[in-house]
Amino acid sequence: MHGLLLAGLLALPLNVLAHPTESHSSGISRRAIDITSYRLPQISKYTKSDAVPKQDDESFTTSSTGDDNVSSGDYVTTATDWLKKTLPKATYRLVNDHYIGDSGIGHVHFRQTAHGIDIDNTDFNVNIGRDGKVFSFGNSFYDGEIPKANPMVKRDFSDPVNALQGAIQTLNLPVTAKPENVKAKPVEGKENFKFEGTSGAFSDPKAQLVYLQKDGGLVLSWKVETDIGDNWLLTYVDANKNDKVHSVVDYVSAAEYKVYPWGINDPTEGNRTSIHLPWFKTLSTDWHIDGKGWYSTTRGNNAIAQENPTGGPEYENNYRPKSPLFIFKYPYSEAMTPPSSYRDASITQLFYTTNVYHDVLYILGFNEKAGNFQVNNWNKGGVGGDFAILNSQDGSGVNNANFATPPDGQPGRMRMYTWNASTPERDGCFEAGIVIHEYTHGVSNRLTGGPANSRCLAALESGGMGEGWSDFFATAIRLKAGDTRATDYTMGEWASNRPNGIRKYRYSTNLTTNPHMYVDADGLTSVHAIGTIWASMLYELLWNLIDKHGKGNVTKVRPVLKNGVPTDGRHLAMKLVLDGMALQPCLPNFVQARDAILDADKVLTQGSNKCEIWKAFAKRGLGVGAVFNPSKRTGSNELPAGC
C-alpha cells in the first residue's frame, strides 16, 4: 500500500518475473480485483513560487532554527489568512501536522469540510518562506456547489457496519464481519468508528463518514479502513448504496554487524564485513534504544526486524537474533539453502540497511517534524510510536517486496520476500536497492501532503512518481567513486537474476540506452512503468548536479552539509528531491513535482542550480512548455531564458 499506500512491490509486473509471484490469498490482486480502477482523480494545482501574487510585508518570519511555536501572527496564521483570501467561501479545518523544515520553510496543510464533514480528497497546502510570506501553495479544494441538506440532521446515511460489509463484498476482502457479531464503537471525531468482532484483518477495521470529490460533485461516503497485510485499504463506500465503491486507496505501495556495507548494493558488488557502531553519533540515540530501554536484538527506536515465515500480522514475538554483547555476526553465502538457514544474517542486514538509510535521510531533512519513522521523537515534534516493522523472509509472497505507510504515529511495515528465479533462491534483504526502494515509499508518502495524510500518491501519475523516487534514491546511493554520467544502472538485477533488471530500460543519461520521454506516460496504467520515466529524469538531474558539484567521497556514509546545503552533487540532488516532496501539492503530477524541485532549489541555494535542473527535465520532454493531461501530455524540450 502506498503510504496508506501499499507501496512497493519493487512492484514488478508479473511478466518481468522468471516465475509467477506466489502468496497467500489475502492480497487484492490475487483475489481477481483490480483496485487501480478505483484510483482517486488527479485534481491538484500547484502555484510555484514565481507565480504567487505579490504580498504585503508580514510580521512573522520563520526561524531557520526550526522554532515553530504556534501563536498569533505566526506562519500558521499567515497560511490560514492566505487560504481565506484565496478561497473566501471555503470551509475547512487545519490538519495538525504543520512544521518548519530544516530549510526554513513552514509547511501548513488544510482539509476542506462541508457541514462539518471532511471532503476527504481535498487539500490546500501552503508553504511559508523565511521572510514570513507565502512561498508557494497547492490546492485541490472542491469549487462546486455544496449540498444544501446537512446529512447529520436527518441521519440520511447507512449504518457503518453495512458499509464495512459493502467494502468486503465488493472487493472480495478476506475479512469476516457478521452483523450479529460486529459492533461499531465510536472513537474520537464525528461519525468515526472502530469495528469490534471481525476476523481476518491485521487490526480492527475503521470507518469514518466523509464526502468524496468525484465527477464534478460531492458524494457522501463511508471511508472504510482495512489492513489485510498485502494491502492496507481505504475504501470509499457510498453512504446510501453500500454495494457501490467510489474509490480505493492502498497504503502499501513493495553495535557490530557483519553485513554488506552501505554503498554495496548486492553480493556481486563486494563482500560482507564487520562494522562497528555504524550510527551517526550526533543523532538522538544508537539503534538499540528507544528511551524505554536497551534491546540486545534487532530492535530499537527506528526499526524492529524479524523473520515472518507465516506472512501474518504478528511481529512482536517473532524470531529475531539476540546478542547480549550487541555483536550481530552470522554466516551467509549465496550457496546456502534453504533461506531459513541464514535468517540471522538476513534480519541483521535488513536492520542495518534500514537504520543507515534512516540516519542519512535524517541529515537531509526527513526528521521527526517531517513525519519520520521513530518510536520516540525526543520532544522534537511530529508523532512518535511509529518505527518501521521490518519482516525478513516474509511468507506472504515471493519475487517482490512492499511497504505500507499509514499516517504519522502508526508504524510503517516492510515485507521482504525471497526470490525464486535462481538456484538457490535469493533473499531480497541482501539487495540494498530493494530495501531502499521500499523504505522510500514511506518517505514520499509522509512528505507529500503532510505527515498526517497518506493518500497523496494515490492517483496514477502521483503513484508512478512514488515508484520513481524509490528507484532514484536506491540508484543514487549505490554510486561508485569511478562512476560518470556514462554509467548505467539497473533495478533488482541480483534478486531477480535478470542481467537487465526489472525495469524496461536501464537508468542512463544516454537516450539510445534509455529513450524515455515525458509523453511516453500517455496510455500507461502501471505505476512502475510511469515511475521509470520519472526516475530517468531524476537520474539526469543527479548527474547534472554531480558534474557541477562533484559526487563527494562515496565511501563516507554521512552526508556533508555546509549551512544546511549538501556540499556534493549526489546528496544535493537527494536533498532537493526530498524538499520538493514537502512543497508539492497532494496528488501531484510530473509538472508540479518538477516545479517543486525548482522551488526547493530556490529556497536552499537561491536558485543557483536552476539551469542544471531545467536541462535535466527538458532533455526528456518536461521543459518549459510541457503540459499535463492524463490522456494526452504535451512534451517540451524548451529551456527558460538564461539557460
From Swiss-Prot:
<keyword id="KW-0479">Metal-binding</keyword>
<feature type="active site">
    <location>
        <position position="438"/>
    </location>
</feature>
<keyword id="KW-0325">Glycoprotein</keyword>
<feature type="compositionally biased region" description="Basic and acidic residues">
    <location>
        <begin position="47"/>
        <end position="57"/>
    </location>
</feature>
<feature type="glycosylation site" description="N-linked (GlcNAc...) asparagine">
    <location>
        <position position="553"/>
    </location>
</feature>
<comment type="similarity">
    <text>Belongs to the peptidase M36 family.</text>
</comment>
<keyword id="KW-0732">Signal</keyword>
<protein>
    <recommendedName>
        <fullName>Extracellular metalloproteinase 4</fullName>
        <ecNumber>3.4.24.-</ecNumber>
    </recommendedName>
</protein>
<feature type="glycosylation site" description="N-linked (GlcNAc...) asparagine">
    <location>
        <position position="420"/>
    </location>
</feature>
<feature type="propeptide">
    <location>
        <begin position="19"/>
        <end position="254"/>
    </location>
</feature>
<keyword id="KW-0843">Virulence</keyword>
<dbReference type="InterPro" id="IPR027268">
    <property type="entry name" value="Peptidase_M4/M1_CTD_sf"/>
</dbReference>
<keyword id="KW-0964">Secreted</keyword>
<feature type="glycosylation site" description="N-linked (GlcNAc...) asparagine">
    <location>
        <position position="271"/>
    </location>
</feature>
<dbReference type="GO" id="GO:0004222">
    <property type="term" value="F:metalloendopeptidase activity"/>
</dbReference>
<dbReference type="InterPro" id="IPR001842">
    <property type="entry name" value="Peptidase_M36"/>
</dbReference>
<dbReference type="GO" id="GO:0006508">
    <property type="term" value="P:proteolysis"/>
</dbReference>
<feature type="signal peptide">
    <location>
        <begin position="1"/>
        <end position="18"/>
    </location>
</feature>
<keyword id="KW-0482">Metalloprotease</keyword>
<dbReference type="Pfam" id="PF02128">
    <property type="entry name" value="Peptidase_M36"/>
</dbReference>
<dbReference type="GO" id="GO:0008270">
    <property type="term" value="F:zinc ion binding"/>
</dbReference>
<comment type="function">
    <text>Secreted metalloproteinase probably acting as a virulence factor.</text>
</comment>
<dbReference type="Pfam" id="PF07504">
    <property type="entry name" value="FTP"/>
</dbReference>
<feature type="binding site">
    <location>
        <position position="437"/>
    </location>
    <ligand>
        <name>Zn(2+)</name>
    </ligand>
</feature>
<keyword id="KW-0865">Zymogen</keyword>
<dbReference type="GO" id="GO:0005576">
    <property type="term" value="C:extracellular region"/>
</dbReference>
<feature type="region of interest" description="Disordered">
    <location>
        <begin position="47"/>
        <end position="71"/>
    </location>
</feature>
<keyword id="KW-0378">Hydrolase</keyword>
<dbReference type="InterPro" id="IPR050371">
    <property type="entry name" value="Fungal_virulence_M36"/>
</dbReference>
<feature type="compositionally biased region" description="Polar residues">
    <location>
        <begin position="60"/>
        <end position="71"/>
    </location>
</feature>
<keyword id="KW-0862">Zinc</keyword>
<keyword id="KW-0645">Protease</keyword>
<dbReference type="InterPro" id="IPR011096">
    <property type="entry name" value="FTP_domain"/>
</dbReference>
<feature type="binding site">
    <location>
        <position position="441"/>
    </location>
    <ligand>
        <name>Zn(2+)</name>
    </ligand>
</feature>
<feature type="glycosylation site" description="N-linked (GlcNAc...) asparagine">
    <location>
        <position position="510"/>
    </location>
</feature>
